[in-house]
């Protein structure tokens, strides 16, 4: 049996703007942001996994992973062969669970498409190694941070690290092009009207 425990992203906004947000406190360990945005406080979540004797008890890692990694990881654990006629954004975490170094093949990409989020101008974030870029709804780089040196995202490096900026932005544009050219996205047509809650 494989048990995975994780949580929804980010605690609710401090204003508790909606009735169901009242008394739903949450902390981010001082990280910038909360739910509805792309700062680390809005996207970082815990994850706990138990898989009998296959994973050492008490093992802890701070290696960045994300939800899209679970599909290839679970498929790998169950010896299930994934179809090869499509691209998977995540990658198997088996090396990490075996206490080896996880070599990322692709950057981590986060998207938010909510017109009523805290900062409605931001739509994408890309993380590659220690660097993270936040991109606005016009697909323009807006923020750049070295999360190893600046985990609280206070020192915007846009314009100060042109090589890193160009590299990250190029990877984002490739990812975005792949999404825009995906047959399911093309079949869907224009984006559907966002759902609003209460």
What role is predicted for each listed range?
Residues 70, 119, 128, 133, ...:
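Long, internal low-complexity/basic segments
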Residues 11-38, 55-59, 63, 68-147, ...:
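C-terminal cap/loop subdomain of S1 sulfatases and analogous C-terminal strand-loop tails that border
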Residues 39-43:
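Short, flexible loop/turn motifs enriched in small residues
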Residues 44-47, 71:
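Structural micro-motif
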């Amino acid at each position: 049996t494989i048990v995975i425990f994780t949580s929804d992203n980010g605690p609710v906004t401090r204003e508790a703007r909606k009735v169901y947000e009242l008394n739903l406190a949450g902390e981010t360990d001082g990280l910038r942001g909360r739910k509805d945005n792309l700062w680390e406080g809005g996207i970082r979540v815990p994850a706990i996994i138990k898989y009998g004797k296959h994973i050492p008890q008490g093992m802890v890692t701070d290696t960045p992973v994300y939800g899209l990694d679970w599909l290839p990881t679970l498929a790998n654990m169950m010896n299930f062969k994934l179809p090869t006629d499509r691209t998977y954004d995540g990658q198997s975490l088996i090396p990490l669970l075996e206490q080896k170094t996880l070599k990322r093949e692709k950057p981590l990409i986060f998207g938010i498409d909510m017109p009523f989020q805290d900062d409605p101008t931001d739509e994408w974030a890309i993380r590659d190694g220690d660097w993270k870029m936040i991109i606005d709804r016009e697909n323009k780089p807006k923020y750049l941070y070295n999360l190893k040196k600046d985990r609280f995202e206070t020192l915007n490096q846009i314009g100060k690290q042109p090589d890193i900026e160009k590299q990250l932005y190029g990877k984002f544009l490739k990812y975005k092009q792949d999404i825009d050219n995906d047959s399911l996205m093309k079949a869907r047509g224009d984006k559907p009207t966002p759902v609003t809650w209460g």
